[in-house]
Amino acid sequence: MAMLDVGDKAPAFSLEDQSGKTVKLSDFKGKTVVLYFYPKDDTPGCTREACAFRDEHSALRKAGAVVLGVSPDSGASHAKFAGKYDLPFPLLSDTGHAVSEKYGAWGEKSLYGRKFMGINRSTFLIDGSGKVARVWPKVKVDGHVDQVLQAIREI
């Protein structure tokens, strides 16, 4: 499925977080949501990205945003990852990758010449009305959270 564009209605979802709690996009109606998709818990790039969101979490909250991370990992894997790095936001389990597909974050990847399906690191900024305000496809981790913060301030 093609990646969502700015102005699109963000697809509804209901996924479990690392504590087993069901989290729905509709829980955050009226709030700005940073929805970031990442490939795998506790891998180098994903850890740097999660820790960058952790380090700027208070600034993101002060700017009025809620951060939600999504990967195909299990709730148990998320709990271990969140605990190890003291991550203060929900990590949602999209084990069947249905939500990742709806957002266009699931697709073909290539590593060492081998092609496979997986999450392409991407972030969606969803405004309080549930519309996509900004999209970052194929995220480069370094400096990304600063870009997200700037975009939140511009909404």
Show which residues each predicted segment covers.
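Chalcogenol-based redox active-site neighborhoods
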Residues: 1-155
